[in-house]
Amino acid sequence: SPRIVNMFTIGDDLLRGSGETLPDGRAFGPRIEALIVYNSNPVAVAPQSRQVTAGFRREDLFTVVLEHFLTDTADHADYVLPATTQLEHWDVHASYGHTYLVINEPALTPRGQARSNAAIFRALAQRMGFADACFQDDDQTLARQAIHGPVPFEQLREIGWAKLPLPEA
């Protein structure tokens, strides 16, 4: 079954065996046999780079990377699928460095065979037979659904950004 791998422990997690005991006493679960990496380059940025690289070099690990550059992680992938850039898809952004919410509208048509991460996951869901309504939502609908709170989607589209109403520190 799918699970999320913590970027901080990805090196160790890719090297763990099935049922191995974690430092907190929990069982690790089944060995990771397949991995889809997107919006990240763990081989270059994750801690414990030796373990991360060793994990990605496993012959029995099936890895797909959604990317618009051939990154260090993409070098270890079985498949690299061309992902759109920020200029080519809908998105909503917040940041660690500021307190604004930003809408990202596509300014360009995707080049070549590039698709947004969400479009790639929708196609994968369809191929796997998932017919739930949530797998039909387009990127703009997902961006709209991601916005909760005091800033309406249409206002954000009109202005492009909004200061989040957070208490002063």
Explain the meaning of each model-derived region:
Residues 1-75, 85-92, 155-169:
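Extended redox/cofactor-interaction regions of prokaryotic respiratory oxidoreductases
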Residues 58, 62, 79-86, 123-133:
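Short, well-ordered loop/turn and helix-capping segments at boundaries between secondary-structure elements
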Residues 84-87, 100-110:
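Short beta-alpha connecting loops at secondary-structure transitions
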